[in-house]
Amino acid sequence: MEHYISLLVKSIFIENMALSFFLGMCTFLAVSKKVKTSFGLGVAVVVVLTIAVPVNNLVYNLVLKENALVEGVDLSFLNFITFIGVIAALVQILEMVLDRFFPPLYNALGIFLPLITVNCAIFGGVSFMVQRDYNFAESIVYGFGSGVGWMLAIVALAGIREKMKYSDVPPGLRGLGITFITVGLMALGFMSFSGVQL
């Protein structure tokens, strides 16, 4: 149990997808103008990562890994295309389930669900899971923790950007300029976790 808690803390803070690996930056910067929309996208990313990482773990270990299907057959060259296909399928299934059973939540998320398909933080989580050879339980914890870490980062950035509306920002830095500086300072803050050994 202690191993899973340390993996969760590690994936949220020490190896934060957005602020340590800088994955998912397109949506991270584009959607972080308001806390409400950032939170909605963050929840969707948590759900997709929590499902996509373990499902791709099963696909990799049961189909793609060397000697998984047949002795002497290695399908690991199909990793990228298979993982992207599984992520896209999961996002479509999630979109249909939300549309059918939770219409208010589906309408609130709107365009954010299809955007998750191309969010490289999702693919990064799956790739790290394979690279680090996590088992199924570890992949669930890692997927959830990575999603929570990404959501924490985007909600924090959105809160800072909302407060910066009332600040006197120099004209040359308004918009993305000050946002990049803010993200850099946030990443420096998260670097302090890199010394923590779990």
Swiss-Prot record:
Gene Ontology biological process: respiratory electron transport chain; sodium ion transport
Regions crossing the membrane: 11-31, 39-59, 77-97, 110-130, 140-160, 176-196
Subcellular location: Cell inner membrane
Pfam families: Rnf-Nqr (PF02508)
One GO MF term attached to the UniProt entry: oxidoreductase activity, acting on NAD(P)H, quinone or similar compound as acceptor
Primary location: membrane
Keywords: Cell inner membrane, Cell membrane, Ion transport, Membrane, NAD, Sodium, Sodium transport, Translocase, Transmembrane, Transmembrane helix, Transport, Ubiquinone
UniProt superkingdom: Bacteria
UniProt membrane topology term: Multi-pass membrane protein
Name used for this protein in its record: Na(+)-translocating NADH-quinone reductase subunit E
Gene that produces this protein: nqrE
